[in-house]
Design a protein with these regions (language model features):
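Short, solvent-exposed loop/edge-beta patches enriched in aromatic
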Residues: 53, 67, 77-80, 92, ...
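Well-ordered alpha-helical scaffold segments within catalytic/enzyme domains
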Residues: 329-345, 391-409, 453-459
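Bacterial Sec-dependent N-terminal signal peptides
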Residues: 1-22
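Beta-strand/loop-rich accessory regions of lumenal/periplasmic or secreted enzymes
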Residues: 24-29, 36-41, 48-236
Length: 459
């Protein structure tokens, strides 16, 4: 069922006519509100649509019990999309969390999901310790985790995309004393939540306010924590308005879905250039201090210190890393290029010292980069990664091309890079892929991952 049929069906339910409203049941749209008294567990109330007559609102969400808050809803047609506008007024002081679900009619197993900057397809390429289908097939997240507060569902079978986007102005947020469970907001927030859920096998777009994250919250890299649900105070007599937009399109494949969603989001949000007090030139000048303050020149391979950096002190550390976080060689190229542009001989000199030291001391016995060296701990990591090795080669190719354009040649580096590319060919699999990790003797380090409950159910 498409959005137009769905919303028109809602209108029929509340007494508004629509020629294309067919096959609607009240289960297509659902909502609930959780109310909390500080110090006590919240109580969730399922809500039901109720028709309104002679009112400024089309319909109202009501519970079986009398609530200290009234919730109205309008559905507005806008450029072929449907805007859901929620109006909420408190009859007494109340801490609340409101949520709504719209079922797409698509089988959840036939769908791929997209939340810009956070979720792609089913996120199965992500580790089990990150948000993915390894943990659950339903996810709700804070809107500010995303590049735009939007969730899209792509039905592979019927080649249709359904999305919901928040349209309110995101102007504020509030602190909490806890990061998980039911949390009381210290003030006003603009941040709601968005996501997708499997409701009895049907994919649904889920959204609400204020934010919550479920079934887990992602607090830092590879760390899933228990879910969180925020409660905001709405004082007696205060009102709140919330707006979301539902959108539907026929799409050929998931790649086109991503492109379409970005274009739709851009057109909807109309982002404007942000005026800043500092010019790009000034910011580059300030950021170039990193090349000065982090440079370590008393080790066999010189490097810029950044791995395991303590932000409280910014003291140099003993870790020299090629690629990934350390990205020493790419930083050296950037410092060289910027240094020559600005006639900064200190940057240029240190950049060449890094390249020269890595040429002499930066390789393993076989000829791969010593990609991570712990100098004070006198330890060189023996397992290589295709990411760091390839990022090192990438940096060197930029360096050699830049030097060639300046009329400078480095035959020893060129010989090294050609040798490394030949070794990469030895590692390459028949399907064109590369092993993620390997040792200096070209033996592959097996990837160990626990099988998720979701994967087990598929077998």
């Amino acid at each position: 069922m498409n959005w137009k049929n769905l919303v028109c069906s809602v209108m029929l339910l509340v007494g508004i006519t629509c020629a294309e409203a067919v096959n609607f049941t009240p289960d297509n749209v659902s909502a609930s509100i959780a109310l909390k008294v500080p110090g006590n567990d919240a109580k969730r109330y399922p809500l039901t649509l109720q028709q309104l007559d002679n009112s400024n609102f089309e319909y109202q969400w009501v519970a079986a019990d009398k609530l200290p808050v009234v919730i109205y809803q309008n559905v507005e047609e806008k450029d072929g999309n449907q805007r859901i506008v929620i109006f909420m007024t408190a009859l007494d002081d109340v801490y609340f969390n409101f949520g709504e679900q719209v079922m797409t009619g698509c089988h959840h197993d036939d769908c791929l999901f997209y939340m810009p900057g956070f979720w792609y397809r089913r996120n199965l390429r992500s580790p089990q310790e990150a948000p993915s289908f390894h943990t659950s097939d339903s996810w709700l997240v804070r809107e500010d985790r995303l590049s735009t507060p939007l969730t899209a569902i792509f039905d592979e079978k019927n080649r249709k995309t359904y999305s919901v986007i928040r349209l309110d102005n995101m102007a504020s947020d509030a602190l909490t004393t806890h990061k998980e469970g039911e949390v009381i907001l210290s003030g006003k927030t603009s941040i709601g939540y968005t996501g997708f859920e499997n409701l009895s096998g049907i994919a649904s777009l889920s959204f609400g306010f204020p934010y919550k994250e479920a079934p887990k919250t992602y607090i830092r890299k590879l760390t899933l924590a228990p879910s969180v649900e925020a409660y905001q105070l709405l004082r007696k007599g205060e009102s709140l308005s919330l707006t979301w937009e539902l959108h539907e399109s026929e799409i050929a494949d998931f790649s086109e879905c991503v492109q379409h969603i970005w274009e739709y989001s851009y057109d909807t949000n109309c982002p404007q250039i942000v005026n800043t007090p500092y010019s790009p030139e000034k910011m580059k000048e300030v950021m170039s201090n990193f090349f000065v303050e982090s440079f370590v020149g008393n080790t066999p391979t010189h490097y810029y210190s950044g791995v395991e950096l303590r932000t409280a002190t910014c003291d140099q550390t003993d870790v020299a890393e090629v690629g990934f976080v350390g990205r020493t060689l790419l930083n050296a190229f950037n410092a060289l290029e910027y240094g020559e542009q600005q006639r900064r001989t200190d940057l240029v000199t240190n950049a060449y010292k890094i390249f020269d030291s890595y040429l002499q001391n930066g390789f393993s016995e076989t000829g791969f980069f010593n990609e991570v060296v712990h100098y004070r701990r006198n330890f060189v990591e023996s397992v290589h990664s295709i990411r760091r090795q390839s990022e090192g080669v990438y940096a060197l190719l930029h360096f050699l091309n830049y030097e060639r354009l300046q009329g400078r040649k480095h035959p020893e580096w060129e010989k090294r890079i050609k040798s490394m590319l030949d070794m990469f060919l030895r590692l390459q699999n028949k399907d064109g892929s590369f092993p993620r990790k390997f040792k200096d003797d070209f033996s592959i380090v097996p990837k160990i991952r626990k099988q998720s409950q979701w994967q087990s159910q598929l077998q």
